Amino acid sequence: IYFLAGRYEFRDKGIDIYIKALGKLNEKLKQEKSRKTIIAFIWVPANFRNIKTQILENKTLFQDIKEALEEVMGDVEKNMIYSFVSNKKIAKEILFEDNFLTEMKIRVARFVRKGNPPVATHDLYDENDTILREIYESNLKNGEDDPVKIIYYPIYLSGADGLLNLNYYEAMQGSHLGIFPSYYEPWGYTPLEAGALGVASVTTDLAGFGRYFCTECSQSETPGIYVLKRLNKSHDDVVQQLVEVMFTYS
């Protein structure tokens, strides 16, 4: 799980670099025939209308499946124990009653959707939102064969948003790599916060913290904090640096 979090400053926060690099990482993982899946979050608040109806419906249907399974777990446990002590092969027909399996098929059929999952969790007022446009231009579609799945989450992580229901630090702790490829940042605490929580991160030599942490130093192959070289480097060069970091870390 990778993430970028911060204010909606598309260029200064390096959101453009992050999305472009994810698009190239997606293609690189395909070429390598990698079996890995990267979930890439963009936790950047924007002017949203509401949570997408499709997501709310699927959340309700998933909860229905979960609760139906929880109701029969006592019987499932008994059936599993019986199968073990009887040295019988465990099969779903032994674990579950026929009527439960039939009902579950109906529930799953309602849950399964055609097409690709949406790249944003909310409907936005601006149909030409810069982040959304960059996602589409980078060919990030959340297709079944795409190793990189992107989730644009345009709401503050309050811990009670109706979806993740995690606060900022909880969401960060549940991730593996925080990416902050800033073009300008007087200091920038986010890589430091990630490190304090035991999460690896990426910063740049144009951010105050990145310059303090490592300007001329030679980094190891897998440092806890990666420092991209953005000073006097082209946009494409920085994108490629980030692609290599994300690919190595995956």
Identify what each model region corresponds to.
Residues N26-K30, D64-L69, S175-G178, T203-L206, ...:
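Glycine-rich loops and low-complexity Gly/Arg-rich segments
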Residues D16-E27, E170-Q173, L192, Q240, ...:
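A broad, structural surface signal
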Residues P181-S250:
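Catalytic binding pocket for nucleotide-activated donors in carbohydrate/polymer assembly enzymes
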Residues R11, K24-Q31, A46-R49, L177, ...:
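Short, well-ordered loop/turn and helix-capping segments at boundaries between secondary-structure elements
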